Regions:
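ABC-type nucleotide-binding domain
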Residues: 330-545
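Membrane-integrated ABC transporters
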Residues: 1-35, 49-64, 78-82, 86, ...
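Short intracellular "coupling" helices and adjacent cytoplasmic loop segments at the cytosolic face
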Residues: 87, 95-119, 123-127, 198-222, ...
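Cytoplasmic juxtamembrane "membrane-exit" helices immediately C-terminal to transmembrane segments
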Residues: 80-84, 88, 92, 155, ...
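Transmembrane helices of ABC transporter permease
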Residues: 15, 19-32, 134-188, 259-273, ...
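An intracellular "coupling" helix at the cytosolic face of ABC transporter transmembrane type-1 domains
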Residues: 10, 17, 106-107, 123-132, ...
Length: 545
């Protein structure tokens, strides 16, 4: 997963190659200054023991302070640079992810679950951000500091440096060996987080029904079961991560014990000076910090790789319905539809089979039938929510699959069974997709949908914010708002999928009459359980499950 995830990240890093080179330079300067500080301190101690003037001692002190300031400046510059890279990469990736998810069909959405996709689009991006910002900065600085530090130690005492190097190499090898297990554990944690998000989203959406059936305790118990699995996964990840993150500190302390003993013997025998001995001790302290930072960066690498793998899995999914390479746009649409031996399979069975229809432009087709007979599927074919498995559907003589999706969907309005409104004003919901619509068009659509009488009851009329999914409106008001939104587009194709099921019979009759007297050259496909809603249609078909 990590390798796949990191390969997926590479294209997003290419625009920042120059920044990465500059960041490497910043890290090299900062690491070099940090690594040279113990050397300067050791020389100052040796000079002090040999007897130097206060002016020389002050020069050493100024040099150490100057190195510390240099480290701070270049670490700051590196952190700012990597933060900017993280922001840019996260922005591009989140845009791509959102665009990809909007193109998913219902089958793909059901496969992942909305909650899981929300988890990938939110919490996974936190780990991508941490990888690019803190993880990259920490790992680059720590690796350079370890390399430069070991090189400077080797110039002072190769045997002591070899001990430190071998122990650090052992630590890194153990981290990489245990890393895949940590990543798999983290991936399982993220999967369970997706399950929690899905469970929460589903039950909050149905909160009123849960309360109406008195199932609050059962829902809490069910959430507890899901949460328990998440907690156990999280504990497993924490234990594995703790083992990996504690290795560098343990190794450096072991190296310190060996250097203290062996280095002391070297001082006594005169192989190294007291200043060089102190220099080694300080180096171990510096390398300990670098090793701890490297462990933290390695953890971010594991988490970022797993998160990138989960996001990449979604981005690699191609939509089931997409533009053909040679797709064309229609400059004008009359609205003549034709179904030719159309068949659609759902889970191995025919939802529609051998359907042939000819719907003249400007006519109305009424569609009735039992639940599960394929009425919604039929409308979905016109909107290209999905494509037929057999036969073809054509608009004005053009196979729908040969048309650009944008061109097709610009010419139609689709009101599905489940009314979906956004948490914005009623007017913004009605003008969704047609910004800047004149007031006359808005009020005409409101009148046709018989929504005018409801406006005085709303606190701010058309400016009233309807809440998430239109929660502040009744079911009938939501459906009529959706119809007004469809009419505001002035489409050539109007698809109504049982769009009046929550509207009372008299108001529904008024809306049907309004649509029947509509003089716009519009082709209408109306699905309804009420025969009264389709009795004036030019054609009526009955679908049998």
């Amino acid at each position: 997963m990590r390798r796949t995830g990191l390969r997926f990240l590479l294209p997003y890093m290419r625009p920042y190659r120059r920044d990465l080179l500059v960041g490497s330079l910043y890290a090299m300067i900062g690491a070099g200054a940090s690594a040279y500080s113990p050397t300067l301190l050791g020389r100052a101690i040796d000079a002090l023991l040999a007897g130097i003037t206060p002016q020389h001692l002050l020069a050493y002190a100024a040099g150490i302070v100057g190195l510390a300031v240099t480290v701070a400046i270049f670490r700051y510059l590196l952190r700012m640079l990597t933060g900017a890279i993280a922001a840019g990469v996260s922005y591009r990736m989140s845009q791509d992810l959102f665009e990809t998810m909007l193109g998913f069909d219902q089958a793909t959405l059901r496969q992942y679950g909305v909650g899981d996709l929300l988890s990938r689009a939110s919490s996974d991006f936190i780990y991508i951000w941490r990888f690019y910002s803190a993880g990259f900065q920490m790992s680059l600085h720590a690796i350079l500091l370890l390399v430069i530090g070991c090189a400077l130690m080797a110039l002072t005492s190769p045997p002591l440096a070899l001990i430190v190097f071998l122990l650090l190499a052992l630590s890194v090898a153990l981290q990489f060996g245990l890393g895949p297990g940590v990543e798999r554990s983290f991936d399982r944690v993220q999967q369970e987080m997706g399950r929690i998000a899905a469970f929460t989203q589903e039950h909050l959406s149905a909160a009123r029904m849960v309360a109406a059936y008195g199932q609050e305790r059962a829902a809490v118990a069910a959430f507890g079961a899901v949460n328990d699995v998440y907690a156990r996964r999280g504990l497993g990840f924490a234990m594995r991560s703790a083992v990996v993150s504690s290795l560098p500190g343990l190794v450096v302390k072991l190296a310190a014990a060996l250097v203290l003993g062996l280095g002391g013997a070297y001082v006594i025998s005169g192989q190294i000076t007291p200043g060089e001995y102190v220099q080694f001790i300080v180096y171990l302290s510096v390398l300990n910090g670098a090793a701890q930072n490297l462990a933290g960066a390695f953890e971010r690498l594991q988490q970022g790789g797993a998160a990138a793998g989960r996001i990449g899995e979604v981005l690699r999914r191609r939509p089931a319905v997409a533009d053909a390479p040679n797709a064309v746009s229609l400059t004008s649409v009359r609205g003549a539809l034709r179904f030719e031996n159309v068949g659609v399979r759902n889970e191995g069975r025919w939802a529609l089979h051998e359907i042939s229809l000819n719907i003249p432009a400007g006519s109305t087709l009424g569609i009735v039938g039992a639940t599960g007979a394929g009425k919604s599927t039929l409308l979905g074919l016109v909107a290209r929510v999905r494509d037929p498995d057999e036969g073809r559907v054509s608009l004005d003589g053009h196979d729908l699959r040969a048309l650009r999706l944008e061109s097709l969907r610009r010419s139609l309005a689709y009101v599905p069974q489940e009314t979906l409104l956004f948490s914005m004003s009623l007017r913004d919901n009605i003008t969704f997709g047609v910004p800047g619509l004149p007031d006359e068009r808005v009020h005409a659509a409101v009148d046709a949908a018989r929504l005018s009488n409801d406006l005085p009851q709303l606190p701010q009329g058309l400016a009233t914010v309807v809440g998430e999914r239109g929660a502040t409106l009744s079911g009938g008001q939501r459906q009529r708002t959706a119809i007004a939104r469809a009419l505001a587009r002035d489409p050539q194709l109007l698809l109504l999928d049982d769009a009046l099921s929550s509207v009372d019979a008299s108001t529904a009759a008024e809306i049907i009459a309004s649509l029947a007297t509509d003089t716009a050259p519009r082709t209408r496909l109306v699905v309804s359980q009420r025969l009264a809603s389709v009795r004036d249609a030019d054609q009526i078909i009955v679908l049998d499950a």
